[in-house]
Amino acid sequence: QRQMCIRDSMHLVLDDKNFVFTSQLTPDAQGNMAYMQTPCRTPWRTVMVSDDARDILASNLILNLNEPCKYKDTSWIKPVKYIGVWWEMIAGGKPWAYTWDVPSVRLGETDYNKVKPNGQHPANNENVKKYIDFAAKHGFDQVLVEGWNIGWEDWFGHSKDYVFDFATPYPDFDIKMLNEYAQSKGVKLMMHHETSASIRNYERHMEAAYQLMNDYGYNAVKSGYVGNMIPRGEHHYGQWLNNHYLYAVTEAAKHHIMVNAHEAVRPTGLCRTYPNLIGNESARGTEYEAFSGNKPFHTTVLPFTRLQGGPMDYTPGIFEMDMSKLNPNSKSHVNSTLARQLALYVTMYSPLQMAADIPENYERFMDAFQFIKDVPVDWDESKYLEAEPGRYIVAARKAKGSNNWFIGCTSGEEGHLSTLKLDFLDNDKKYIATVYEDGKDAHYRNNPQSYGIRKGIVTAKSALKMKAVAGGGYAISIIEITDKTVLRDLKNLK
């Protein structure tokens, strides 16, 4: 059961324990479900049924139950592939905060120029420039920087109303210089607005925050809603909050800003109507791998559930699975092989894709990193070759404006064997296929970094025998041959 086009309404929460078709509506702080002015429309609720799981993945039912685009001009809305100052905090244990000297911050009063820096703050000029250089070298569009703004010392767990102003940088983050440096390299910075769930505070600062983005050249923001809501007693999925999430998107559109909301309500297809809602988290993403880990089957289920309502900023691309290598105090492990991390860029649809690991880990595996560099984030066509929720998904997508295809497979605990018929390719063309696959001894827990790369010629008559190990997968780039001289050095791939 799914819901679409939630506007001016509450979110429906299914009973996923008893597996019966009963549900509850998310109330407000007073226990009321909604305040509706008549005449009004309630959201669509649907049930999708098929005897072939691929049909559900290919369905556009939820998008089509939403209204067409509200914007006359969408030329400013662009797909984004990005890296960011984030994983070293989430997984590496580094702080968003600038100092340990201020246990209680007062906006406008606390003087950060008089405190002692903790020396561990990653959102600093030198580190951000390193990320900008890496992005420019490898063709990424943007660099996210979290922890750039004052207020992180006491941001969580205090039910604090005036928590951030979304405008004042820490002393070690030169917002003007860094934006100019990024733009000189052909890269943009991505803004970060963590609200600490203080919605009133975000809305009182929103216009100035968006204007600041315009002033410095930002065109995308990652927003966050961690914690208990303010106004106190409101819920993440109630009517009032759903109206806020949409308000943040429509106000951003006035400034030509794209929004990637984390911890917000699960999307219901509104990205068709408001396409600057370029991404959402709204499910267990890769960050949970740094906490307790996601089960291997997790990413074989999400495309049937969460992603039916809109693209997900899953933040894949982790190459170092042992979190103790980044943070000695961590016992967490990413439940995936390296090849599977590549496949997620195809199976987890989003026009906003992050290469989430730190640059140093990519530099250790540059041959595998090539797939992340090559894979598009905008597509003309999608095909679902094999699918069984909880077990495996094999997706193929055609790059926007080209004849190139990309294939991704993610598997659960059982692994998966495939014979991929490439009959969706053009009959009169030849292609170079580069296969990134699990090594023979690969395993998501014991040997996740074992992978192999092979390359050869394929056509529409080709059939590739593929294997994904437990918690593994594979990724394939299929590039149209335009220079026939390359044929001399390659054999047909099987």
Where are these predicted regions, by residue range?
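C-terminal beta-strand-rich structural cap/linker in extracellular carbohydrate-active enzymes
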Residues: 455-493
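An acidic-aromatic substrate-binding cleft motif
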Residues: 40-138, 142
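Aromatic- and carboxylate-enriched substrate-binding clefts and catalytic-loop regions
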Residues: 147-333, 337
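Solvent-exposed beta-strand/loop surfaces of large extracellular or lumenal domains
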Residues: 435-461
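Glycan-recognition and catalytic regions of carbohydrate-active enzymes
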Residues: 357-406, 410, 443-447
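Carbohydrate-binding surface patches
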Residues: 388-431, 474-477
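Conserved, mostly hydrophobic/aromatic
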Residues: 135, 259, 347, 407, ...
